[in-house]
C-alpha cells in the first residue's frame, strides 16, 4: 500500500503538468471531454482545506481563453498587481464549478508560454526596473490608448477561424464568448467601458526577449515613441552606459536609436486638455526632437531623475569634450535614423495594424505611388525632365540666383540649427542686405520662412553647456533668436558676418565664450577675425555683397563720369577693328538688341576693366614718383662722390656717412620700385584678359577722345586684340554707324559711302 501511494504521489504531479500543457493546445471535442473527466477526478483527490495544497490544477480555459493561467502563477511571486487580484477573485467566485485549482509546488520551474499566437497588437510593458528587482513585463492590447490608461480595446472581425474553447463539455467560439470568458474581443459600448475597471494582463517574457538588454540598464520600459508623421510606435526604451537606447522589439540585438544623454536637453510636458499623453521631449544636437510618452507623472519624474544622475557626472568633469568628440557621428546617425523612420512609417505601418485601422492608413500608403512612378520611368524621360527643370531654374529671381551661385564665393550662406518653440530645427540661412533669411532648404530659395533685420542687434555667444557652439541675436537685450553651428569654425564665421552686418561697435576680440576649452576658443576667435575682416573689407562693403551681374543696364552709362574712368564701347562695323586704349576716356556700351543676351558677360567685363584700369593708373603714378625720387637720389649720390674726392679729415668722414645713408635709401627705393613693377605687370595681364573677354562676348575697346577724332592723333599703346566678326546675321542686325573708327582710310571711306546711299 505504501508503494502504491508513493507511485500515486509521483503520478499526480506528472498528470498535473500534462493537463497544463494540454490546456494551451488546440484540442478536439473528444479530447476536451477526456480532459474534463480527468479534471473531475483530480478535484475528488483535492485535499482538505487545512492540508498542504501540493497538487492543484486550474482549468485555464475558463479564464481569458488560457491566459489567466499565467496570471495565477504571479500569486506565488512578490508582485503588486493592484486591480488584477480583485478581478481574479471575481472570476474565481463566478466560476468555482468550472475550474479546479492546483498551483505548482514552489520548486517547480516556470511554466512554458502558451503556444497560441497572441493578437497582432499585443505589446509588452516593462515595469520600471529598480535595484534588486527582477524585470516584470505587462502585456496590453490597445495600442491607440494613452500610455497611462491601457484599455482592452482590441477588436477583430468576426469569422470562423477563432480557436474553440470548451467549458464543461460545451463548445464556444471566441467571438461568441461572454465578456468575462474571453479576452480576444471587448465590447465597444461606451457606457460599459466607462463602468469597467482598467485591466492589465501579465505574461512571462519569452526566451527571445533578450533580457541581457536590460540587465545593466539604469531604467527600462516600453514607451511610445512619436514618429515623424504623428504615429506612435511602442519601443523598448532603456538608459544604459549614459545613453538612451530604443529597440523596436525586445528580440532585437542592436538598438534602433542610440543617443548620448550628455548632448540632449530633456523636458517634461504633462498631460492636459490638448495633449493626451505625458511626454518626455529630448532636444537632439542636430535640431530634431525625440518625443517619448510615459504612463504617468510619477514615471516621468523617475525617468528625469535617472537622466539627471546620468548627465551630472559627465557635465561636471568636462562639459565640452563629449560635444566635440561625438558631434559629427551623432548627426550622421540621427539623419540615418530619421530616414529609416520615415520609411517604416510609409511602408511597414500597414502590416502591423489590425483590419479596423486599414481605412485610416490608406491615405498614408498612397505616397508609394510616386515612388513607383519614378521607378518605372525610363532613363530618357528622366533626363528630359531634368533638362526641363534645369532650364526653368535659369529664369529664377535675381535673389535666388545670387544666393545659389555664390555659395562658394561669398561665405554668407549655410546650415544653422534654429531654436523654434523649444525645438531645434535645421534651416538654410542667408545674409543679404543686413537681413538674415531662413529657408527650409537650400533648394527652395524663392520663399523664406522668416527674416530678421540685423540693424541695431547684438550677437552674444553661448547657450548652455549642452550647446557649446550656439549663439544668440539680441535686440535691446531681448532675445530675437538662438542659432547653433556645427563646429567651432562655422560658429566663428557666422559671428564675424553677423558682427559686420549688425553694425555693432563690439569688436571680435571682445566676445566672451563659455562652455568651451582654450583650444576651441582660439579656433573660434581666429575664424571670427577672418570673417569680420572679409565682411568689412572694401570688396564686400562697396559692392554690398552684390556680383557684377546684379548691376542694372541703365546704370552702366554715366555721362558725368570723371576722365580716366574705363568705358568700353560696342563696335559696329562690317569687319574687324583694332582694339586699343587711348589716353582719354574709354567707354563700355551695350548693343541695344543684344543687351539681355550678353548682360552677364558684359557687366563682368565692364567691372573688371574699370577696376584694373584704375589700379593700373594708380600703380603707374606710384612708379613715376619712385622713379623721379630715385633719379634725384642718384644725382645727389654722384655729387657727393665728386665732393668726397676733394675733402679730407673730419669733413670726409661726414661725407662718407651721408653717402652710406643715401646708398641705403636708394636700395630701399629700388626694392619698392621692383615690387611696383611686379604688381603692374600682374595688373596689365589681368586687364588684357578682361579686355580679351569683352570682344568674345560682344564688346570692343575703342578709343574716343572728348573732341572729334583727328587724323594726326596717335594712340599711346599698340593694338591689343582684333575683334572677329564670325556671324553674318550678327552683322546684319547691327546698325551701320554706331561708332566711328579713329583711324583708317578704308573704313572712313566706307562710312562716307554708306551715308551717300539713298
From Swiss-Prot:
PROSITE patterns: PH_DOMAIN. The keyword Cytoplasm applies. Keywords: Cell junction, Cell projection, Coiled coil, Cytoplasm, Cytoskeleton, Repeat. It is found in: Cytoplasm; Cell projection, Podosome; Cell projection, Invadopodium; Cytoplasm, Cytoskeleton, Stress fiber. Residues 102-120 have a biased composition (Pro residues). Residues 602-690 form a coiled coil. This is Actin filament-associated protein 1-like 1. The gene is afap1l1.
